[in-house]
Amino acid sequence: MEWTDDGIVLGVRRHGESSAIVELLTRAHGRHLGLVRGGAGSKLRPVLQPGNSVHAGWRARLDEHLGYYALEGMRLRAATLLAVPHAAYGITHLAALARLLPERDPHPEMYETVERILEDFDDATMAGAHLVRFELAMLGELGFGLDLSACAATGVTSDLIYVSPKSGGAVSRTAGEPWRDKLLRLPPFLREDEDAAGCTADDLRDGFALTGRFLLRNVLEPRGQGHSDARDGFINAVTRPRGQGALPVVALPDPMGR
């Protein structure tokens, strides 16, 4: 069995003295692991960093085996990204979200989305908006999508500013006014006709509160999980008031202890 594909490095762990098990999110083969001979050495260190894009060749005697990867770096963005304070948290959180997908189950649209996110990840506000949208997309991919296209109470498609915490449906300003304190806020950048250009820190907090509630209830808690420290760190980093000074750059831990 063998195939070639493009992939994004999600994680790496040492295997034996000199090899490493590498986890990729691939375009056509989903989230897939493989053994890289020499992967624990310094030669491949620049390539085997979370967030990098690679071209992968995989082979195994049987399809169900772990198999072996031959990897070639395509877009080695990790070093540049990790000079940005929020990026280490963001890449770690992206990888954790990708691991919610079943192993070896193709999700080409999610792969393309992660590629686009990583290419536009240096700006904190845009990175925050991208991650909220990715969490929303992940809910949909896992079968728990939110209907933000029309008011759940009246069917109108305009002035949607709330979301029901029970149904996950959008609610218009007029219909939601009597229960505004019990509804989640739908930030402008999640509405179909809006972009993230004017997104504020409060908008990002509202977005993460929205997606976080449904991820926790529908996906994480049934698996015995909760929100990660990386997610919390990322939200703090991208919503931090500029007047408070810069956060220190957080490095990704070296999975092979080098």
Curated annotation (Swiss-Prot):
This protein's UniProt keywords: DNA damage, DNA recombination, DNA repair
Matches recorded under Gene3D superfamilies: Nucleic acid-binding proteins (2.40.50.140), Recombination protein O, C-terminal domain (1.20.1440.120)
One GO CC term, this protein: bacterial nucleoid
Pfam families in the cross-refs: RecO_C (PF02565), RecO_N (PF11967)
Domain of life, per lineage: Bacteria
InterPro entries linked to this entry: ARFGAP/RecO (IPR037278), DNA_rep/recomb_RecO_N (IPR022572), NA-bd_OB-fold (IPR012340), RecO (IPR003717), RecO_C (IPR042242)
GO BP term, example: double-strand break repair
Biological role stated in the UniProt entry: Involved in DNA repair and RecF pathway recombination.
Family, per entry: Belongs to the RecO family.
PANTHER family linked to this entry: DNA REPAIR PROTEIN RECO (PTHR33991:SF1)
NCBIfam families linked to this entry: reco
Name of the protein this chain belongs to: DNA repair protein RecO
Taxonomic source organism: Rhodopseudomonas palustris (strain BisA53)
Organismal lineage: Bacteria, Pseudomonadati, Pseudomonadota, Alphaproteobacteria, Hyphomicrobiales
Encoding gene, per UniProt annotation: recO
